[in-house]
Regions:
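Amphipathic alpha-helical and helix-coil boundary elements used as assembly
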Residues: 1-514
């Protein structure tokens, strides 16, 4: 379309204008296309246009060329509709934005934990809720994300723009459609021929070049940031390729507006390498701790189901490193992993989400059920869980009270509530194995068996099974007084035996009695 277009050849739906006064459309990379116009309307339509406008009001702009052909130059949704009256004349001013804005409204918090997922699959997963929305992947070439990716308090548009920047590429809205549509990266093969213009400007974007080199954008040269600004009657879109002054250039910005009653298009043209944004990161995630539940454990890594989303592929989800108290490269340190279904936190120390790691199992008490008139105080049994990684979670059940059997009964000095005293440190597994360090004692227990080392009462060993003591060398027992109590005591050495039973027996090759 290379004909001169005037006001009468512009149609803006759904508005019927008596006369169009001002009109402007701005299209650029990495942003939504925007349109504004002001026109005179009939007095009887003013309330209809203002009051009936909402987020579903779709705006279409067509121009009709000299051959009678209609061409769409903008489609979008109304953002602001205003009517003002000057000397009895009713003016309508409308601001609209392209349909890609629908991706830029709601913020999301969700994770993508499948390293084998391709960027193209991720793009389609994000835009799937938007009906017939379309995103054309022009840059990733089927590459997999290869790591953990987090969308944290970002709109889908912000998230997609950030992902595209990791390929040093922009998002480009396609505005001629009634649904969100965009290019993920600079399109190829959209050659629109040569532009002839005797009026143009040329400038060098020195600041943008410095920013690109300081942020290590690969393959850029200072000549890539020479930009031309030309006027043309051709209708072009950002991402289109043209030839100007013998160079292949891309349209990076298109401004369409009325000048002296003629529709004029002003384009900014740049080399392809000059339209390469620096890598963008989500810096709001720095220092965030996000709760999740452990669903898998292997060596020093865990699999996590985040509580903020429901995206989890059990076969291919991501393994997070678990931060332990101490670990070193020579395989020394403290190895204590959480258990499955434990609540845990994922910590993000930097703006790179792939650098996150798991830390700190978190005890969460189950909420007590609401009391009913029929319930008695004795009809509720509450269990709690000790601190440290591992173990079953707290539970509350409506059942008759059952006497508990635990280390607290074996040793009355041990409290059932292991978090009652901050001075008492405990390490307990879900199988009931426990080490307790109190100011006045140490307790190592397993069910009904325990070893108690008490400052006041000494050492107590209690076992429901055998106690075996084996020494490869000498064993020395020394005490002021020693008492051994058993149904039968037998001492053996080199074929000699002393038996203390209902009768006392001495068996040896030689027995001397003095």
């Amino acid at each position: 379309m290379q004909h001169v277009i005037t006001y009468d050849q512009i149609e803006i739906m759904p508005y019927k204008l008596v006369r169009l006064h001002d009109f402007k459309v701005v299209k650029t990379v990495n942003d939504h296309a925007r349109m504004t116009f002001t026109g005179i309307i009939d007095e009887h339509r003013r309330e209809l246009y203002v009051k009936a406008s909402d987020e579903d009001t779709q705006i279409k702009v067509f121009v009709t060329d000299g051959n009678g052909h209609r061409h769409p130059i903008f489609r979008g949704i109304a953002m602001e509709v205003e009517e003002h009256v000057v000397n009895g004349v009713h003016y309508l001013t409308v601001e609209a934005v392209s349909h890609t804005y629908e991706l830029d409204i709601k913020r999301h918090k969700r994770s993508f934990q499948n390293p084998g997922m391709t960027y193209n699959e991720l793009i389609h997963k994000i835009i799937a809720p938007y009906g017939k929305a379309e995103g054309q992947d022009m840059v990733t070439d089927g590459q997999a994300i290869g790591t953990f990716v987090m969308q944290y308090d970002e709109t889908d548009w912000e998230f997609l723009k950030r992902l595209a920047s990791h390929f040093y590429s922009p998002l480009i809205p396609a505005v001629g459609y009634g649904v969100p549509k965009f290019y993920f990266g600079l399109p190829m093969g959209l050659d629109k021929g040569e532009i002839d213009s005797i009026n143009y400007k040329v400038n060098k974007r020195v600041a943008d070049y410095q920013r690109a080199t300081e942020n290590h954008v690969p393959g850029v040269q200072d000549q890539d940031f020479i930009q031309y600004e030309v006027e043309s009657v051709k209708v072009l879109e950002p991402g289109y390729e043209v030839t100007f002054r013998g160079q292949k250039l891309l349209v990076s910005e298109a401004v369409t507006e009325m000048r002296e009653s003629v529709l004029t298009h002003t384009y900014k043209l740049s080399p392809r390498s000059g339209i390469r944004p620096i890598k963008n990161y989500n810096r709001t995630i720095i220092g965030a701790s996000i709760y999740g539940k452990v669903v898998g454990i292997h060596r020093d890594k865990v699999q996590i189901k985040f509580k903020m989303d429901e995206q989890l592929d059990q076969s291919t989800d991501f393994w997070f490193l678990y931060s332990t108290i101490y670990a070193s490269a020579d395989n020394t340190g403290w190895y204590c992993m959480p258990e499955e279904n434990d609540d845990i936190r994922i910590y993000f120390p930097s703006y790179r989400e792939e650098e996150c790691y798991a830390m700190s199992s978190v005890k969460r008490d189950a909420p007590a059920p609401a009391a009913t008139p029929a319930a008695s105080p004795a009809s509720v049994v509450s269990g709690s869980r000790a601190s440290g990684g591992g173990g079953s979670s707290s539970s509350v059940a409506s059942a008759p009270a059952i006497p508990a059997t635990s280390a607290a009964q074996m040793d009355p000095r041990v409290s059932e509530d292991r978090m009652a005293d901050p001075a008492v440190k405990t390490l307990r597994t879900k199988s009931g194995k426990e080490i307790m360090l109190a100011p006045d004692k140490i307790l190592v227990s397993s069910g009904d068996m325990y070893i108690l080392i008490s400052d006041s009462e000494g050492i107590a060993i209690n076992s429901t099974s055998n106690v075996n003591i084996v020494a490869a060398a000498d064993m020395l027992l020394s005490a002021k007084q020693m008492q051994l109590s058993a149904d039968k005591i037998q001492l053996m050495g080199k074929g000699n035996t002393v038996t203390l039973d209902s009768i006392t027996e001495f068996k040896a090759t030689e027995v001397k009695m003095n």
